[in-house]
Amino acid sequence: MEFLVRTENLLPNDTPEELRDELRKGERERAMELREQGILKRLWRVPGRNATIGLYEADDPAALHDALVSLPMWKWMDVRVEALATHPQEKQQRLS
């Protein structure tokens, strides 16, 4: 299944810089692992916000949840997930 995942970083402004750097590093490393596992397909930044939009692929919502909670910044994220279904036009293009 494919999922569109919108995340916004809600890390408090008074978080020590050392902790911020550690979390960012861990987040990058974990994202690369998810890419290597074929779970994280694409990732975009949202201009003007501390937010991302990602295209994820997982067997089911529970597997996606497991991937998301493995992110070091999970507890400071506002996460919105939309399950995606293939549009009929996409199905037709694949057959052509």
List where the protein language model places each region.
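Conserved, structured core segments of small domains
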Residues: M1-S96
